[in-house]
Every structure is written in structure tokens, then in C-alpha cells.
Curated annotation (Swiss-Prot):
Name of the molecule in the record: Maintenance of mitochondrial morphology protein 1
GO molecular function, one term: lipid transfer activity
HAMAP family: Mmm1 (MF_03103)
Record field: transmembrane: 111-131
Cytoplasmic side: 132-444
Domain SMP-LTD: 207-419
UniProt organism field: Vanderwaltozyma polyspora (strain ATCC 22028 / DSM 70294 / BCRC 21397 / CBS 2163 / NBRC 10782 / NRRL Y-8283 / UCD 57-17) (Kluyveromyces polysporus)
InterPro entries named among the record's database cross-references: Mmm1, MMM1_dom, SMP_LBD
Chief location category: endoplasmic reticulum
Function recorded in the entry: Component of the ERMES/MDM complex, which serves as a molecular tether to connect the endoplasmic reticulum (ER) and mitochondria. Components of this complex are involved in the control of mitochondrial shape and protein biogenesis, and function in nonvesicular lipid trafficking between the ER and mitochondria. The MDM12-MMM1 subcomplex functions in the major beta-barrel assembly pathway that is responsible for biogenesis of all outer membrane beta-barrel proteins, and acts in a late step after the SAM complex.
Length: 444
């Protein structure tokens, strides 16, 4: 191809020189007469230069076949040039110059078009993404009235509420899943089954637990309460103040009541045989824990007062009374569950009117087969005393058990509202630093 380019250049030069000498050679004459010998010379020169073959080798008769091959190739190029001359009568020099100019002009055109397309893309991006109106809504949504302020307020409130609900529902997730993926069309049964599956607890086959660790925690809590009661007599003083404030509400035949004994025990309750099961009549929509509790201790409360005979005049006769009531044994099956306000019905009007019915509650109750043993001591009289009268003991025991059954025995239960588990600033505390532990360098 380089040789053809040189040939084209020579042809153009030949034409120009011919014009300068006012001698015109047609393209047909050049192709038929001059071009074959010229091409043969070019091929032979290239072979001699590339392979270092002497000139005498090309003139020998042994290479007649090679010369014939070269002549055939020259004839091919001659026919090609004839076709070009018949079609356009144009020279190779003008063709190459036009191709070079065309390639340069196509590069400039592509560069300009590329820059222009980039500018158009930037303009569309700035217009539709940067300066777009974010407050525009769909045409199907109702537009607020410009004449009514209340309409504008209600519309903005609805828009904000819809935006906030959609926003929070889209970002709230549980374990990588959205809120709608986990809660839509899923009842309490599915949620409980999911919980049991994730904690590897089978209600039907899981054995009962001993709760030894729980007994240790409860024992530490009770021991702390007892130490505070022993170091400070705040419980006794508080109860005496309470009874004194209620003296005006006491019957007229009772004198002031004073506390003579308060025994908070020295033993601890034992919790055992804990098992999780479905609540009865809940259709497997609620779980509860059954725990057996056993307390073998002495919890005593003693008082003294006087019976007054106010007829025919006040304090005609006075009869001293001393009572001591002690619980020495308590056994029961404790039922504990978590619930909300929608799962139970209040038993009194005061409970029904309470405003704290939202949130979750810890519900507990005792089975009807509970056992509560008492040790009741009574002493009536000043000189001739009546001690431990069975009738008094039975009456006191009956009223205590009645009070307990009406509040804590199934189907009645007690609910304790659970506090919020989210961290709050008002519940934050720091450990108090003792001044004796401060280094001397900081103290100075």
C-alpha cells in the first residue's frame, strides 16, 4: 500500500509537471505504457532491498516465472486504475487529499456534536432534578381552597400525617423486613409461634425449669429490703402515723391502735417447676408461665387496742385487746403473663375510669388450690385474761383469705403496668465518686 501511495504521488507529480511543460499525458496512456514498467521496477527494487538480492539475479532466465508473476500483478493494478479512470477521470492525488480533508472534518464534527450533547444533558438534569418543584402533587389529589384558612390547615395536617405514616412505615424494619411484611394478616398465634421458634422453646416437650437463678435475685432483693427496715424504723413509724390519721374513721368502741410487733422474716421464697404454656380458652393466642412457689417463714403483725363501753357514759368500761397474726406457710401455683389493656375487664369503677390503660402489663394470679397457714395469738382482758380464743382466730383467718381471694386468686388477677423500656434522659444515673478515692493531684 505504501508503494501504491508513492505511485499515486508520482502520477500526480507527472501530471503537474506535464501541465508546467504544456505536455498533457492522458491517464489511459499512462496506465497502458508507463505504469507497467514502473510497477515492475518498484517490485524488483523492494525485493532487492528487503532480501538483498543482486540485480543480475532478476535479469537471469531462471526467474522468468517470477517476472511473469510480477507482470500478472501489474496487470491487476492496471485494470484497477483503468476502472477508476473510466468512472471519474480523477487522479489519486486529489482522492487522497479529499480523504485526508474528510477525515479531519469528521473529527471536528464529532467533537462539536459530543460537546453539544453533554451540554444538553446537563441542562435537562439541572432543570428537572435540581430546580424541580418538590411540593407538586398528583392531579387526582384535591387541592386546598385558597379562600378558607381552615381548609388549608386541615389539608396540610392530612398531608403531613399521611407523609409521616408512609415515611415511618417504610423505614421501620424487623430483622431486615418491613413492618408490613411481618404484621399484615398475622395474628397473635403466628407471632407467638415465631417467638417460640426463634428461642428454641417447644411448649409441648420442653421440661420444667428450676429457676435457681431467679431465687437468688429475689433473695437479694428481699434481703436489701429487710436491711433497710432494720436499720431504719421507717416502716413501723409509717404504719403508726397511718393508723393515727385514720383514728377519726374508727368505730367509737375502739381506742387508738398501736403496733406492737412487726416481723418481716428471715427466710426466702422458693420458685420452682416453671413451664411456659398456652393460656386456657385463648385459642393459642396467649402464653403464660406456671411457677410453683413455697414460702416457709414467719411474717407477723401485732397490734394492741382497747374495747370501749360508752354506755351509759363514755368509757364506762375498758377491755384491752392484743392480737398477733402471723403467716407461717404459703404454697401456691403462680401464673404470670404479659398482656395489654384490651385483654381484661376492670372490676371496679375506679379501675374503669383510670387513664393508664394503654401500654403493657404484667399480670399475675394464684391458683385456687393455694395453701395459707396462720398462727394467730389473741389476749383479751386485764386481770382475768382470755388467751387464744379459737373463734377469734377463725374470724380473722376467714377475712384475710377473703381479701386475698377477691384480689389475687383466679379468675381475678393483679396487673402491674410495665414502664417504658426505651432509654430516657431522666432515668440516666452516674456512679457517685467517693471523695476519699480522688487523687491528691486532682484535689489540689
Amino acid at each position: 500500500m505504501n508503494n501504491l501511495d508513492n505511485l499515486a504521488g508520482n502520477m500526480s507529480n507527472l501530471t503537474i509537471q506535464g501541465k508546467g511543460n504544456e505536455t498533457l499525458i492522458s491517464l489511459d496512456e499512462y496506465v497502458n505504457n508507463i505504469l507497467p514498467s514502473h510497477l515492475k521496477k518498484i517490485f524488483s527494487d523492494n525485493l532487492r532491498e528487503n532480501y538483498q538480492i543482486p540485480r543480475e539475479f532478476f535479469e537471469s532466465a531462471e526467474l522468468s516465472g517470477i517476472n511473469n508473476k510480477i507482470d500478472q500483478e501489474i496487470q491487476k493494478y492496471s485494470h484497477l486504475l483503468k476502472g477508476l479512470s473510466n468512472n471519474g477521470q480523477t487522479s489519486f492525488g486529489s482522492y487522497l487529499s479529499n480523504s485526508n480533508s474528510f477525515s479531519g472534518w469528521s473529527f471536528i464534527e464529532g467533537f462539536i456534536i459530543g460537546q453539544f450533547s453533554v451540554i444538553i444533558v446537563l441542562i435537562f438534569f439541572i432543570k428537572f432534578f435540581v430546580f424541580s418543584d418538590g411540593s407538586s402533587s398528583n392531579s387526582s389529589n384535591p387541592k386546598p381552597s385558597l379562600n378558607s384558612r381552615s381548609d388549608r390547615t386541615s389539608f396540610s395536617y392530612k398531608s403531613n400525617s399521611m407523609l409521616s405514616s408512609n415515611f415511618f412505615s417504610s423505614i421501620m424494619k424487623r430483622g431486615g423486613k418491613t413492618h408490613y411484611e411481618t404484621d399484615i394478616d398475622s395474628g397473635n398465634t403466628n407471632r407467638l409461634n415465631t417467638i417460640l421458634e426463634k428461642v428454641y422453646y417447644d411448649v409441648d416437650t420442653h421440661p420444667s425449669e428450676s429457676l435457681d437463678w431467679f431465687n437468688v435475685l429475689i433473695a437479694q432483693t428481699i434481703q436489701q429490703f429487710r436491711e433497710e427496715a432494720w436499720q431504719r424504723d421507717n416502716i413501723v413509724h409509717s404504719l403508726n402515723d397511718f393508723l393515727h390519721s385514720k383514728s377519726s374513721e374508727m368505730p367509737s368502741y375502739l381506742d387508738d391502735i398501736k403496733i406492737t410487733e412487726l416481723d418481716i422474716g428471715d427466710d426466702f421464697p422458693i420458685f420452682s417447676n416453671c413451664k411456659i404454656q398456652y393460656s386456657p380458652n385463648s385459642n393459642k393466642k396467649k402464653l403464660e408461665a406456671k411457677i410453683y412457689i413455697d414460702l416457709n417463714d414467719r411474717l407477723a403483725f401485732g397490734i394492741e387496742t382497747k374495747l370501749l363501753v360508752n354506755y351509759p357514759k363514755p368509757r364506762t368500761a375498758v377491755l384491752p385487746v392484743n392480737l398477733t397474726v402471723a403467716i407461717v406457710r404459703f404454697q401456691a401455683c403462680l401464673t404470670v403473663s404479659l398482656t395489654n389493656a384490651e385483654d381484661f375487664v376492670p372490676t371496679t369503677k375506679e379501675t374503669a375510669s383510670s387513664q393508664d390503660d394503654d401500654g403493657y402489663f404484667l399480670m399475675f394470679s394464684f391458683g385456687p388450690e393455694y395453701k395459707m397457714d396462720f398462727d394467730i395469738e389473741s389476749l383479751i382482758g386485764a386481770r382475768s385474761k382470755l388467751q387464744n380464743i379459737p373463734k377469734i382466730s377463725s374470724v380473722i383467718e376467714y377475712h384475710i383469705k377473703k381479701w386475698f381471694v377477691e384480689r389475687c386468686v383466679e379468675p381475678r388477677f393483679q396487673c402491674i403496668r410495665l414502664p417504658s423500656m426505651w432509654p430516657r434522659s431522666k432515668n440516666t444515673r452516674e456512679e457517685k465518686v467517693d471523695t476519699d478515692d480522688v487523687p491528691l493531684s486532682k484535689a489540689e
